[in-house]
């Protein structure tokens, strides 16, 4: 597969993850009804965007739905909706996550972590640099800006991967953190395990390393690749996870971070991740989703199969693409993004925004087989 070579200083990704702070309506709870046992048989997540039925393949949401255990769990949690989340309830989820990840419960922070972490570092450490790859997801960096944080942008390498040597070389005495998304978004590329381990180990000796692993669950070998292994060794590393991707809880915006004990404690002293910042329904959904490893495995297999089919279609169209590891493809159409996106929208398919300077590349979320066929046909029509 032909690989592109591009350089340049690129803008940050303005998208954000925000945590659910209010209760859900009965209609919203009904939307969490159990899905079919097989992920492939689950209902698609198309939405009426305009007058036509538009496929939302723009935000890397899961079309396969949450675990069938989530709906009943949320229904049961409605009984507790009049009550604030207690410390004991939050601790139960922290213990569940800690057991799953092999860390201590006090290292688990549930709630708005990336943005709050960026703000905390800027406020507590003083003005300084926050290094990250561009184009990319820059929520943490953007959150630090109003408090003296300075974005230090490092372009992707020729294979559209995080440029590990360049990121490492950019660390300076005033660097407050190095933020890396692996697999990367929007390219989907995965930094190799051994190389990434060496990179993190070297970087964390000089600054805090924050690894966003939002898409790592789509890999069968996620546990062997996760930077959590380095955190367990006592390294200066924070790992962020969201349940908005493979667990299909984007509408609840549930996630957590795993951090060194000292940093986790400092964040809690600032009120980050406390019981008051949670809600009954999100906690119930998270606990149920994390417990259903069978559903996660089904979704992983389904997405992997559909990713292969997408690559076959793209090859057939004569297009080059990255070896994306998440639930999306990143492909060079050879045409302006705006024209392709507008053409696809006319065909009822919404894709992600442009990621400059890759102005001819498009990111398309992998949906259900039916959704993907529709998107592939639309892409072929637009490029004909």
Where do the protein language model's features map onto the residues?
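PLP-dependent aminotransferase-like
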Residues: 123-180
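Active-site pre-lysine segment of PLP-dependent enzymes
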Residues: 99, 164-173, 189-209, 213-246
């Amino acid at each position: 597969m032909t690989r592109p070579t591009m350089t340049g200083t690129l803008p940050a990704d303005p998208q954000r993850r925000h945590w659910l702070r209010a209760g859900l309506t009965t209609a919203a709870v009904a939307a969490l009804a159990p899905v079919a046992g097989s992920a492939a048989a689950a209902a698609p997540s198309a939405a009426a965007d305009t007058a036509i039925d538009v496929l939302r393949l723009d935000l890397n949401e899961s079309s396969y739905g949450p675990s069938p255990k989530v709906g009943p769990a949320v229904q049961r949690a409605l009984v507790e909706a009049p009550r604030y989340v207690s410390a004991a309830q939050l601790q139960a989820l922290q213990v569940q996550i800690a057991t799953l990840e092999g860390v201590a419960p006090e290292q688990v922070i549930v709630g708005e972590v990336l943005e709050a972490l960026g703000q905390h570092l800027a406020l507590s450490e003083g003005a300084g640099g926050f290094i990250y790859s561009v184009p990319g997801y820059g929520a943490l960096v953007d959150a630090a800006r109003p408090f003296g944080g300075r974005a230090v942008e490092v372009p992707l390498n020729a294979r559209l991967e995080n440029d590990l040597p360049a990121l490492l070389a950019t660390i300076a005495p005033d660097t407050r953190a190095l933020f890396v998304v692996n697999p990367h978004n929007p390219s989907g590329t995965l930094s190799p395990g051994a190389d990434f381990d060496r990179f993190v180990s070297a970087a964390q000796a000089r600054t805090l390393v924050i690894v966003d692993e939002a898409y790592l669950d789509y890999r069968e070998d996620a546990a062997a690749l996760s930077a959590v292994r380095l955190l367990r060794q006592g390294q200066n590393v924070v790992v962020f996870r969201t349940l908005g991707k493979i667990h299909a809880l984007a509408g609840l915006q549930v996630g957590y971070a795993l951090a060194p004990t000292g940093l986790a404690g400092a964040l809690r002293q600032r009120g980050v991740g406390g019981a008051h910042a949670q809600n009954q329904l999100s906690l119930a959904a998270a606990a149920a989703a994390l417990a259903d490893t069978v559903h996660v495995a089904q979704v992983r297999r389904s997405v992997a199969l559909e990713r292969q089919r997408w690559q076959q279609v793209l090859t057939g169209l004569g297009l080059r693409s990255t070896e994306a590891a998440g639930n999306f493809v990143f492909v060079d159409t050879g045409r302006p993004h705006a024209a392709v996106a507008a053409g696809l929208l006319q065909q009822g398919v919404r894709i992600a925004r442009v990621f400059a300077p890759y102005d001819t590349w498009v990111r398309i979320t992998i949906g259900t087989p039916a959704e993907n066929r529709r998107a592939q046909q639309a892409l072929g029509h637009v490029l004909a």
